[in-house]
Curated annotation (Swiss-Prot):
Main subcellular localisation: nucleus
The gene coding this protein: Zbed6
Protein name: Zinc finger BED domain-containing protein 6
Lineage: Eukaryota, Metazoa, Chordata, Craniata, Vertebrata
Alphabetical list of InterPro entries matching this protein: HATC_C_dom, RNaseH-like_sf, Zinc_finger_BED, Znf_BED, Znf_C2H2_sf
The UniProt record lists the keyword Repressor: yes
Organism of this sequence: Mus musculus
Amino acid sequence: MSVCTLSVPVSSISPGRRCSTFGDAGILGCVSINSNTDEDDVVEGKMVAEGANKETKLPAKKKRKKGLRIKGKRRRKKLILAKKFSKDLGSGRPVADAPASLASGAPEQDEESLFEGNIEKQIYLPSTRAKTSIVWHFFHVDPQYTWRAICNLCEKSVSRGKPGSHLGTSTLQRHLQARHSPHWTRANKFGVTNGEEDFTLDLSLSPPSPGSNGSFEYIPTDSVDENRMGKKRDKSASDALRAKRGRFLIKSNIVKHALIPGTRAKTSAVWNFFYTDPQHISRAVCNICKRSVSRGRPGSHLGTSTLQRHLQATHPIHWAVANKDSGAIGNGLDETETESSDLLNDTMPGEKSSGSQDLTAEDLSDSDTDEPPCLEVENRSESPIPVADQDNPVHAQERETTTHCENAAANQISQAVIQMIVEDLHPYNYFSTPAFQRFLQIVAPDYRLPSETYFFTKAVPQLYDSVREKIFLTLENVQSQKIHLTADIWTHDPSTDYFIVTVHWVSLETASSPSNGGTPNFRKWAVLCVTGLAKDCLITNILQELNDQIGLWLSPNFLTPSFIVSDNSSNVVHAIKGGGFTHVPCFLHCLNIVIQDFFCEHKSIENMLVAARKTCHHFSHSVKARQILQEFQNDHQLPWKNLKQDETGHWISTFYMLKWLLEHCYSVHHSLGRASGVVLTSLQWTLMTYVCDILKPFEEATQRVSVKTTGLNQVLPLIHHLLFSLQRLREDFQVRGITQALNLVDSLSLKLESDALLSAMLKSKHCILATLLDPCFKNSLEDFFPQGADLETYKQILAEEVCNYMESSPGACQISSSETSGPLVRLGTDSFTSIKEGTSSAGSLDSSAAGSVAVGSKSSLLPAAVAVVDEYFKEKYSELSGGDDPLVYWQRKVSIWPALTQVAIQYLSCPMCSWQSECMFTTNSHFHPKQIMNMDFDNIEQLIFLKMNLENVNYDYSTLILSWDPENKAVQSNEKEILP
């Protein structure tokens, strides 16, 4: 059956002026104007209005038909119109003339009185279910399976229900929310209704007014006169969108939320504090704290339980006041899905979305009368609007201040807990112990500690991602294209080794000056990865992991590794060399190998170390022995220091153990007399003294290397200093006539000079150039250079490095050439000057002097590079002492020698060792092997990464805003923080 749209005003005209069916029954019926049915046709109609004359009584058998009311969900009841209805319209007349006959029988009256209420309602035609839901703008019925609908966007077929049962639109709506959220949000915002009018009748329903006669009038909208309807359209032009939606008032004059057909009725009181997130339909934003709270997974059931728990936990005062004022305590349960009128308002930026915006009476009614509406809504769960801040504004401000203080205190406690986990590596279950819970109850009774699962799965990973992002953003701003890496493997697990990669660079612009006014720190470093590898991992696995980290961190920022520093692990060394990288041995590991070999070579030293370890073990494991030792120290007024334990494989811990025994030798000797089986002979005490004296320079060198301002420029001077110190000790022992000590000194000196790794470092190009570029040592280079090394040759190599940089950076080439044009004419007659003169006259260097120098543009740049290097060596330097960072000097030369400065930064920024991981994996750190075994493997990698980076990154924990909502969500602030 075809359909049409009729606009029907309510009138109080007497029944005689209308057809008898309307006068007797008071029931509105309609027949399509395009229908040619005869009087035997039975027509079905859907009604949503009351008859105008409620006093008229129906026959007994039809009394139940009197009037229709909306109860609960809106129900469209079908009424079968009797054949008498067709006869009263006039037998033999076309059905299309029926409305005209009705209109002719009505008295003439003002047209505006017929639309006084201007509140529209929909009446549906027979045998047609109106597609009032806006989801049908995105779907069409599947022609093959009528119980399914096909999405117009993705062409996916979605079920509407079981065949033969009720077919709804809830599944279609959830599909749009999950798969096409932007389209669905936009449709809700602008209230799309085009294409639905063919299924509806517009029934204007208003309360009786003195100017209205209460008559019914049928006007088919297909043939309506535009001039006749012009006044009404002009009147409602400003509210065109709202006029297309059904509006009504509750009889108690409390504004009811206008609901979108097919959407969830927001009857819960929590929506007075939330609005739907426009970007994420499955989340809601709190109006008080502006936090986004999840309502459920996208595409699944979206409830309000989490929103209510958020209010109870974070804003208990507002929630309690709202419940008290509205009497709606417990109204925060999940809403039931309903179908209602299709009404939605546009929202301005900054306002709540349509799903949570309350409509006022002025928005819903354009009537000039003050009489209550005649439309009654019964048995519907009304949701009065609780207002949280209707009381005194001063009290409301005090409550907001109190809530803000409570939230700030809770955030500080939460940040402190995460800081303890990361920096001290406390196990997660430590905070769940009853003792800590009692402590927390005393300190912060209102604070609720999240579960350990939250820290493990959300807090630590989010902090981990934040720190990684900061490091990556910092690497984007690195000026030099060449940086350096350190690669180490540390063992603290029976089956797993930890592979650590650290990046090092120099930033002359962002140097942070210490508070005490010392030397600024230009050297920056960050740990890139902490990866667990199996004990039996191959060289290819290490190389693959190294290449992965380079591709992840360096390649996107156009950075290349210049040198890679590592220990003497054969797998790591072979992996670095196999990947084509330049390997630099770790200086501390080289010293450790030399001293460990020195211990093993002398049997007397080994026996002395065994007795010393037993002595320390006796005092560390016996409480009574420590008490006796401390009492003896106190009785003789001797200073007491904590016992130092020896760590296998590290000579520095052995040195500190021997030093502690010598400092407490008098007390230890008397205390050991009472203990059986632990004896240190006088010869061993004497040998211990010799060993400590010999190792003292090595301990000083180790402390020197551990300083953050040291680089490859210290390798040659430190080796020279060690050899010189051993020579002075030999002379002292020779004067004193101590043969045993002389033999020990000679043995260690020989090992230091003949060690393969140290010898390779002494002759390596990068160590020599780094020493040349340190202004502290440029005037005494002959003392540091190994035998057979020519200073002029390395000056030439340095000039070639500067020339290469000029060729790759034309800007630096122009500055250097213009500023060094003068010195080319005023060159001396030394060997290095002759190279420059030969280059200037012939355009290229002699093959014996510069075999690797290219011709062409490079040959034209070489004279300028040679001039810059010669000017650097001729400059007198007395501003800084040998203990200061040479980068301070080069910071002042950036504008004078830009190319030479960049080459100097490249060599001076390379570290001598990986002291960062050395400090992490030692007995003095908080890193305990037992703790690793009890933790998750992947998470312990993140904890080590954070512990090593947080202090260096200077992360501000106050920027980590943690909200313990029911889903334990943590929100990291969007501010991007850059490394200092």
